[in-house]
Amino acid sequence: MKRNWRQHYNVFLANLVLVFGFALNILVAKQSLNNTTPQFRFLFVTPFLGVVIGAVLYFFDVKWFLIDYPYKKFHFQKKWAIVYLSGVIVFFLNVLIGVVLLVVMVNYITNQILEREYERLFTNSLPYLWSTTGTSIVLSLISIGMSKTAHFFIDIEILKAKKGEPTDPNKTDNRAVVINLDENKKNEKEQSPPSAEMTSL
């Protein structure tokens, strides 16, 4: 994979893997909860793999962003960096919500088993499983949208900077300074040194 922030798809792959991790959990639950002895540990396997792989992909995305586009080298608006980092935060919020819903589901099913209700374990777990998957899809789309928007606008501003075009005339430091020559002459007259006669006095 090429180390270039503009040319890879780590953000898309990270969110895709995370969504698949939660979605495949529906099939895992169907197999593990319909058995005579429910196996809860399998419910954490695919989400765990999705979280780990997604986090690694996002780590490289942030790392390459910091290496390729430091502020000292390129002058783009920092708001796009904030948008990009917000996309990263949404991804980890996605992870947190998914794990919390999964833990709540396992706790609910455990209480059913303690009450000797084994027949509808999978059916009762479906609302939690679909809620986790749906939430993951929505937050992943938000994360991808924010990250790719930042990618796009930072690239545009960097290309403008390379061509010598100001990215935003109202926010750059190279503004024209207006000097009033008449005012300067007036100040010079007021600050002129005293004459020789005044000095002798």
Swiss-Prot record:
Compartmental location? Cell membrane
Instruction: Give me the segments passing through the membrane.
Output: 9-29, 42-62, 86-106, 126-146
Where do the segments described as Disordered lie? 165-201
Topology versus the membrane, per the UniProt entry?
Multi-pass membrane protein
- Its predominant location is membrane
Could you tell me where the Polar residues compositional bias lies?
192-201
Q: Does the keyword Transmembrane apply?
A: yes
> Which key words are in the record?
Cell membrane, Membrane, Transmembrane, Transmembrane helix
Q: Where is the composition biased (Basic and acidic residues)?
A: 165-174, 182-191
Which residues, if any, are the signal sequence? none
* Xref: InterPro entries: DUF5453
Entry GO terms, CC? plasma membrane
Pfam families xref list: DUF5453 (PF17534)
| Protein name as annotated | Uncharacterized protein MG028
